[in-house]
C-alpha cells in the first residue's frame, strides 16, 4: 500500500520564496512550477496564510512521477504598509496516492494516517 512509504521529494521553481513587486493597487499573478521528483504518483494541495489576499490556481491535483504543473499564485490589490504581510506564505502539501487510485484528487488522502509532507514558500513584498 502506498501510504506505508513516505512521499518522495518535490521541486518547486522558484525553490525558496515568491516575490511580488509594487505597486499593489492591482492584482498580480506569479507562476510557480511544482515537479514530482519521486517515483510514485502524488496528490498535492496548496494552502495560503491569507485567503483574502492570496489565491492559487489550481489549488490541488495529482502528479505522476516526473510530471510537473504550473500554478498561478495571485495577489489581490491591497494597501501596502497598512496590512501585516510578515507571515504570508503558501504551503505545498503532498502525499502518495493509494495504489490503483484514479488520477483524480481526493481530499481524504490527507485526512487518514498516511504521511503528508509540506514545503513552505514565504512571500516577499518589495515596496
Curated annotation (Swiss-Prot):
> What Gene Ontology terms describe where this protein resides (cellular component)?
cytoplasm; cytoskeleton; pseudopodium
Looking at the record, the residues that make up the MSP domain are 9-126
Principal localization? other
- PROSITE patterns with a match to the protein in the record: MSP
- Which Pfam family, any one of them, does this sequence belong to? Motile_Sperm
On this chain, the residues bearing N-acetylalanine are 2
| Name used for this protein in its record | Major sperm protein 10/36/56/76
Q: In which organism is this protein found? A: Caenorhabditis elegans
Gene name linked to the record: msp-10
Amino acid at each position: 500500500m502506498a501510504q506505508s512509504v513516505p512521499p518522495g521529494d518535490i521541486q518547486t521553481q522558484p525553490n525558496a520564496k515568491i516575490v511580488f513587486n509594487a505597486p499593489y493597487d492591482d492584482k498580480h499573478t506569479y507562476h510557480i512550477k511544482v515537479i514530482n521528483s519521486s517515483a510514485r504518483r502524488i496528490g498535492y494541495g496548496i494552502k495560503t496564510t491569507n485567503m483574502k489576499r492570496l489565491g492559487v490556481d489550481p489549488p490541488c491535483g495529482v502528479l505522476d512521477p516526473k510530471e510537473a504543473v504550473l500554478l498561478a499564485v495571485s495577489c489581490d490589490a491591497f494597501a501596502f504598509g497598512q496590512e501585516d504581510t510578515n507571515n504570508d506564505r503558501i504551503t505545498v502539501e503532498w502525499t502518495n496516492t493509494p495504489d490503483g487510485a484514479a488520477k483524480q484528487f481526493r481530499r481524504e488522502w490527507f485526512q487518514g494516517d498516511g504521511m503528508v509532507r509540506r514545503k513552505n514558500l514565504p512571500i516577499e513584498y518589495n515596496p
